[in-house]
């Protein structure tokens, strides 16, 4: 079984020196890292590179990790070319792109040739016949966890208002299903633009399932919102609203996000590797979580390689699926994270949010 503890995994004793005087030569594996050098997340590539290299350096005495970095882009042509270079590199394992559209292309063209680890949240339909191993919770896991938290307070009525885009519809469906399954007596769903219909309802709990349309909704319904006992937001609209005149109406509103896995030591190492000490001024920046999961993925891959004693794809997958975190299996058989803990955020009178507690859906 694989166990990661702290920033460095213990792999002592996996292989033996051929003599007491000679230093053993570490076995070698190859990892392809699909970085984001273009598109809206163009800035992430340099972060992914630095994190992967840190992990490779930390593993150097036990397994030599050779890395190749490729950008899958957002077109079939770019993805094919990037994967062709990864295959020419003879990679044993792949870190997936951090955007779902690019990850779908990679899944389409790899055809289960090697295990794939996802280091960022991807859509639930991103998979091969052999599942991606996800080091972050999926969007659906986060939404179902929110439904679990809400249901534990036993509300009698819950109203979900949702936007007309795909995000709003998907979140609404997951929430409605999760709440109903958990015994909430009355769950209503209404489009976010149906303001007259919404005003006629007096729900105990309101969930706003939208992104950009949330601002318009809050503005139009500022006089109605105080009548709701508890408001919840979703990851897509968890934001700072201090600039808006209606911000105070969000006081007491709650939301959840997966707990930040990074440490001050890791953030400092990353900033130093990048030569960008200014990054430390915002320790909650999302780039640190991406960097950590990239670092973690390379460590996990190296340990799986040693456990499997082979670069055979099936052996590597088995070793990865059997990996543990805090004494428990890390992944479900589907490749999803088995246990995810959350930070609960609450809004103050100024329309900004801050951590106020923890939640575990397990």
Residue ranges of model-derived segments:
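Short beta-strand segments enriched in small/hydrophobic residues
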Residues: 25-50, 58-60, 97-98, 158-161
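Segments of small-molecule ligand-sensing domains
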Residues: 275-356
């Amino acid at each position: 079984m694989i166990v990661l503890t702290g920033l460095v995994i213990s792999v002592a004793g996996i292989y033996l020196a051929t003599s007491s005087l000679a230093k053993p030569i570490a076995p070698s594996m190859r990892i392809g890292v699909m970085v984001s050098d273009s598109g809206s997340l163009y800035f992430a590539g340099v972060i992914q590179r630095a994190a992967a290299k840190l992990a490779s350096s930390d593993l150097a005495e036990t397994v030599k990790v050779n890395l190749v970095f490729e950008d899958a882009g957002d077109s079939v042509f770019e993805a094919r070319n990037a994967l062709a270079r990864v295959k020419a590199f003879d990679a044993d394992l792949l870190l997936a792109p951090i955007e779902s559209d690019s990850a779908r292309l990679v899944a389409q063209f790899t055809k289960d040739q090697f295990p794939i680890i996802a280091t960022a949240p991807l859509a639930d339909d991103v998979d091969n016949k052999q599942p991606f191993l996800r080091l972050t919770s999926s969007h659906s896991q986060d939404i179902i966890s929110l439904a679990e938290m809400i249901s534990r307070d036993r509300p009698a009525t819950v109203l979900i208002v949702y936007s007309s885009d795909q995000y709003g519809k998907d979140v609404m469906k997951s929430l409605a299903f999760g709440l109903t399954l958990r015994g909430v007596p009355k769950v209503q769903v209404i489009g976010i633009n149906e303001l007259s219909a919404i005003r006629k309802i007096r729900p105990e709990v309101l969930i706003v399932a939208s992104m950009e349309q949330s601002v318009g909704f809050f503005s139009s319904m500022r006089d109605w919102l105080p009548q709701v006992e508890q408001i919840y937001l979703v990851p897509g609209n968890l934001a700072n609203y201090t600039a808006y005149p209606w911000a105070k109406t969000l006081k007491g509103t709650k939301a959840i996000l997966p707990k930040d896995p990074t440490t001050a030591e890791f953030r400092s190492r990353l900033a130093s590797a990048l030569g960008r000490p200014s990054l430390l001024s915002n320790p909650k920046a999302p780039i640190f979580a991406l960097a950590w999961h990239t670092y973690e993925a390379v460590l996990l891959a190296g340990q799986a390689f040693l456990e499997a004693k082979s670069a055979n794809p099936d052996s590597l997958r088995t070793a990865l699926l059997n990996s543990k975190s805090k004494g428990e299996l890390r992944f479900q058989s589907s490749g999803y994270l088995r246990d995810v803990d959350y930070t609960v955020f609450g809004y103050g009178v100024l329309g900004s949010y801050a951590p106020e507690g923890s939640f575990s859906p397990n």
